[in-house]
Regions:
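Glycine/proline-enriched, intrinsically flexible loops and inter-domain linkers
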Residues: 2-92, 100-119, 123-584
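Glycine-rich phosphate-binding loop of nucleotide-binding enzymes
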Residues: 95
């Protein structure tokens, strides 16, 4: 795409039509992918994004609800492809695959498929789909090889900017190589065809837009949209008091503790997020190469309700040195690449809590969800199977309202858990419980949202991936302004002959038929003093089962009648006054 430096007058009506048409193209790509994909992680969980990028690797548009941490650095892959092939090295009919960690910086399941689009022989940009493949080979299946991997090659098949179609001609040998090295080739090839179809649709729709309004008008509109988006974001940042703000937290994993230290600098309309204080890379899968955590925190703070494009991040500078856990040097394992991102976002917001006390929420569950994975061989159907889902947690209380319960991480867009009926229909597994986790939300004037309990039983022997908290099992979602932390996540396992559940310390567990796993996701932190919560809201929480009567008494100082029908206002006032005195 030609860079247009000098803005010329655009018809404002046409500009608005194009402004809305671009994300509509990405949305249509998304709908096409969702309807035609083979694996549940795409068509049910929606673990993907669809996007258009220009010939500089800048983001033109993404689908509404696309996985945030997929899109935030998608341009890195396209820029690498441009450097590899040159702008003259792309032809109509090309289809390129890429998941190599040295560039993509994620676990290998997140496969990027992209195609170039042209008008009158000129390359104008790329249609891109990044989607979670159910398997990519390696030592294990599921969400990457997890705790069983010992180097990046044991995590799976690395594909580095390979053209599986060149000028419309398929490379069948390359496709066979991919099929022969993954466990579920039919699903993977079906998903690949879905990704290709979505990209082709994006090509057609963008070309139609150019044919209707003209090349120059569309390209100038895109540049204008970039500039206007940047200006809106900068306008919000300019309202934050200048200064240097810092905060820290941590993650825990089998490979040890990871420090998350953040420094945010505000200078006028510029924001810098410095992650230099985070732990260095190390063995273990919680490494990545991504700016996504910083980008997501910035987008949510500025114009969260508007479509994202390259201008959304133009006012942000991110500092991450090479060798940092967020900018790990290849070769290094990245199976749990995204585990740190929600905590990075929370910690950036925590740093700004003093500057924006009426905007910043308490910490959310801080995890990408308990990894509900079970895989093996189903003798009843004579096939291998894998069950993958994501269990959501609680969001932090806000300055004016409670946190949302059982919601996905801020990093995950519209990702959702898989329906139980579909899980059980297609796999030898029985889901015995999926329910709100009582008392998991942090007490506060505005309570943290609740996590969820999910209990599942194997109907055949297999392997569980029992990763419960995404690295936040010892770092509870913190409260703000007197709010209390939410409960941490945990995973419990039980064999068919065991009388009781026991805590799982391993990310993998070999289970016989009848074995069970319970995932308990974290709740969000509370916002404000729990003793200031309206007693009537505490009563409703007890009656709805969100909190116990004991929590009402112990955490909120609210005395209920024995039948839990009313608040004893006199006893409540006395108890709260007494506790306030004890705090002095």
């Amino acid at each position: 795409m030609t860079v247009i430096d000098a803005p010329r007058t655009l018809d404002p009506v046409t500009l608005e039509v194009i402004r809305n048409a671009l994300p509509a193209i990405s949305d249509e790509m998304s709908f096409d992918l969702q309807r035609t994909s083979y694996n549940m992680m795409i068509y049910e969980v929606r673990d993907y994004c669809t996007a258009l990028l220009d010939t500089q690797g800048r983001l033109i548009s993404q689908n509404i609800g696309g996985v945030s941490h997929f899109v935030a650095d998608l341009g890195v892959v396209i820029k690498d492809g441009i450097q590899r092939f040159g702008l003259d090295g792309f032809a109509p009919g090309d289809v390129i695959l890429h998941n190599h960690q040295a560039v993509a910086g994620q676990h290998l399941n997140n496969m990027v498929c992209y195609t170039p689009f042209f008008h009158d022989g000129e390359l104008l940009g790329f249609a891109v789909v990044r989607a979670h493949w159910v398997d990519i080979g390696g030592q294990s299946t599921g969400f990457g090889a997890g705790g069983t991997a010992y180097d990046p090659w044991s995590e799976g098949l690395q594909i580095d900017q390979l053209k599986i179609y060149e000028a419309g001609v398929v490379d069948r040998k390359l496709l066979k190589l991919i099929r022969d090295n993954i466990r579920y080739p039919d699903a993977a090839m079906g998903d690949l065809r879905s990704q290709m179809a979505a990209c082709r649709l994006g090509e057609r729709r963008f070309t139609e837009l150019v044919e209707r309004y003209g090349r120059d008008t569309v390209l100038r509109s895109i540049d204008t949209i970039y500039r206007e988006t940047e200006q809106k974001c900068r306008g919000v940042v300019a309202e934050i008091p200048d200064g240097v703000y810092s905060a820290e937290s941590f993650l825990d994993a089998a490979s040890g503790r990871y420090d998350i230290k953040v420094k945010v600098t505000i200078s006028g309309s510029d924001m810098e997020i410095d992650l230099s204080g985070c732990s260095p890379q190390r063995e273990g899968g919680m490494n990545s190469r991504t700016f996504a955590g910083a980008h997501i925190a910035y987008k949510a703070l500025t114009v969260p309700l508007e479509p994202v494009n390259e201008g959304s991040f133009a006012g942000l500078r991110v500092v991450i040195p090479e060798g940092n856990m967020m900018m790990a040097r290849y070769p290094v394992m990245m199976a749990s690449w995204s585990g740190a991102l929600p905590t990075v976002v929370d910690t950036v917001w925590r740093a700004l809590a003093d500057a924006l006390p009426q905007r910043i929420p308490a910490a959310h569950s801080g995890s990408l969800g308990a990894t509900f994975v079970f895989f093996g061989y189903d003798p009843r159907r004579d096939r291998r199977f894998v069950v993958q889902s994501i269990e959501s947690g609680g969001w932090g209380g806000r300055p004016t309202e409670d946190g949302e319960s059982v919601s996905m991480s801020v990093c995950q867009g519209d990702v959702r858990n898989a329906p139980i009926e579909n899980i059980e229909l297609k796999n030898p597994i029985l889901v015995l419980e999926r329910a709100l986790r009582q008392d998991s939300g942090g007490p506060g004037k505005f309570r943290g949202g609740l996590g969820i309990n999910t209990r599942a039983q194997a109907l055949v022997p297999g392997r569980w991936a029992a990763g419960g908290g995404g690295g936040r099992v010892n770092c509870p979602p913190w409260g703000l302004w007197g709010g209390q932390p939410g409960k941490i996540a945990e995973t419990l396992i039980k064999g068919p002959a065991d009388a009781e559940f026991r805590r799982s310390e391993s990310p993998r567990y070999i289970g016989d038929a009848g074995s069970e796993v319970i995932h308990r996701t974290a709740g969000g932190g509370g916002w404000g003093d729990p003793l200031e919560r309206d007693p009537a809201r505490v009563l409703v929480d007890v009656q709805e089962g969100y909190i116990s009567a004991q929590s009402a008494l112990d955490d909120y100082g609210v005395v209920l009648t024995p039948d839990l029908a009313r608040v004893d206002l006199e006893a409540t006032a006395k108890l709260r006054a007494h506790r306030s005195i004890l705090r002095r």
